Amino acid sequence: METLLPSLRVPDGPVELSGETWLEIGFGGGEHLAAQAQQHPDVTLIGAEPFQNGVASALRHIDEAALSNVGLHDGDVRDLIERLPEGGLSRAFILFPDPWPKVRHHKRRLVQSDFVGELARVIRPGGTLRFASDWADYVDWSLARFLAGGRFAWTAEACADWTGPPADHVTTRYEEKRLGDCAPVFLDFVRV
């Protein structure tokens, strides 16, 4: 970790992006991040994860696959997003974030109105956002916040569009645990 992370860490200060760039927020063990990087070698993927065990796991996946199109932010994604340029991202993923299911903890949820506004700032018009959760209340909560303000449009046309994993989805260890109170739900949005 001490040798690979410094070369992949997103530097402090304003982030300069070139070419197509995707962001995975809270990449957990890094399985999805590494798989997307492998499937899309012409895309730069940035992963943000505050927990050291997740970062170490992602580094292992990146090293084993010899990936050269990944950058990592080992901290709170909000610190990174405020440094990203307007419209710099073409895609973002928020997959199975901590649901904070108790009402008194809802203020700790990642998906809040201010955060959605910051995401809208950094995702270019026409760019996409995927949110997935296995907690019904968090799905409802997030859907309402992503649709508020008209910055994102939900792309679903039929029930199957959110009840099954998208074709390009990579299942993670966390997702396999099925810790939530419902089957996984996948919400795809486009930046208006």
Model region roles, listed by residue range:
Residues 126-133:
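Conserved beta-strand signature within the Rossmann-like core of class I S-adenosyl-L-methionine
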Residues 25, 48:
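Conserved beta-strand/loop positions that form the S-adenosyl-L-methionine
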Residues 144-192:
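Class I S-adenosyl-L-methionine
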Residues 28:
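Conserved glycine-rich SAM-binding loop
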Residues 1-23, 31-40, 59-86:
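S-adenosyl-L-methionine
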Residues 51:
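Conserved SAM/SAH-binding beta-strand->alpha-helix loop
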Residues 111-125:
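A short glycine-rich, Lys/Arg-flanked "PGG" loop and its adjoining helix->strand segment in the class I
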